[in-house]
Amino acid sequence: MDLQSLASSIPQDTLLVILAYALLGGLYLLVVPLALFFWMNSRWTRMGKIERLLVYGLVFLFFPGMVVFAPFLNFRLSGQGDN
C-alpha cells in the first residue's frame, strides 16, 4: 500500500483535523517557545514588573516547548564567565 492510496482512503475531514492538530502542536512546542526565548534574551535587563510577570506566565504556559529547547540554547548575560 503506497502513501497516495493510504491518503485517499482517509476522509478529508479527518485529514483537516490532523493538519490542525499538527499546526497547533507545532505552534505550542516550537514556534512560541523559540519566540519567547529570544524575547526574554533581548529584554531581560529592561523588563518592567508587569512585563516580567506576563513573561513568567507565558513560560509556565509553554513550559513543555521551553524544555525541548533548553538544552540547546544558552542565554547568559554578557560578561558572565569571563576571567
Curated annotation (Swiss-Prot):
InterPro entries: NADH-quinone_OxRdatse_su_L. The chain crosses the membrane at residues 18-38, 53-73. Its EC number is 7.1.1.-. It holds the Pfam family NdhL. It comes from the Bacteria. One of its GO terms (cellular component) is plasma membrane-derived thylakoid membrane. One of its GO terms (molecular function) is oxidoreductase activity, acting on NAD(P)H, quinone or similar compound as acceptor. Disulfide bonds: none annotated. It is found in: Cellular thylakoid membrane. It catalyses: a plastoquinone + NADH + (n+1) H(+)(in) = a plastoquinol + NAD(+) + n H(+)(out); a plastoquinone + NADPH + (n+1) H(+)(in) = a plastoquinol + NADP(+) + n H(+)(out). PANTHER family: NAD(P)H-QUINONE OXIDOREDUCTASE SUBUNIT L, CHLOROPLASTIC. NDH-1 can be composed of about 15 different subunits; different subcomplexes with different compositions have been identified which probably have different functions. NDH-1 shuttles electrons from an unknown electron donor, via FMN and iron-sulfur (Fe-S) centers, to quinones in the respiratory and/or the photosynthetic chain. The immediate electron acceptor for the enzyme in this species is believed to be plastoquinone. Couples the redox reaction to proton translocation, and thus conserves the redox energy in a proton gradient. Cyanobacterial NDH-1 also plays a role in inorganic carbon-concentration. This is NAD(P)H-quinone oxidoreductase subunit L. It comes from Parasynechococcus marenigrum (strain WH8102). The gene is ndhL.
